[in-house]
């Protein structure tokens, strides 16, 4: 699995103008799933996202709290393009998990 993690003051996902999901302060995470990923990869990434110390404390000390300690939220967005490779002038996505497998895998990731 691959993740692009960004601290945000707020983030949202809209499709055709309709709000799908939103969060206040916290993290926005783009998640790519490799064709060979397993439950072990889900567990590792979930643990990493929940324990990364990316936020400051009340005393101003930077990088001292994780998303759970600071009471923030996480917005996850599935992004198969994180597993592209460049073949000449074309993008190749053969390393990304196929949609039929990745949807239940992603849902398992979200519920973890």
Annotate each language-model stretch with its function.
Residues 1-89, 104-112:
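N-terminal, polar/charged subdomain of small-to-medium soluble alpha/beta proteins
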Residues 87-101:
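A charged helix-plus-loop insertion that forms the helical arch/lid used to bind
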């Amino acid at each position: 699995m691959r993740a692009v993690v960004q601290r945000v003051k707020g983030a949202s996902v809209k499709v055709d103008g309709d709000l799908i999901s939103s969060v206040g302060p916290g993290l926005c995470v783009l998640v790519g799933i490799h064709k060979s990923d397993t439950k072990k990869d889900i567990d590792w990434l979930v643990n990493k996202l929940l324990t990364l110390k990316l936020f400051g404390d009340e005393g101003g000390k930077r990088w001292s709290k994780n998303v759970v300690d600071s009471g923030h939220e996480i917005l996850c967005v599935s992004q198969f393009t994180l597993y592209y490779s460049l073949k000449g002038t074309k993008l190749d996505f053969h390393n990304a998990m196929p949609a039929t497998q990745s949807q239940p895998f992603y849902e398992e990731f979200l519920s973890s």
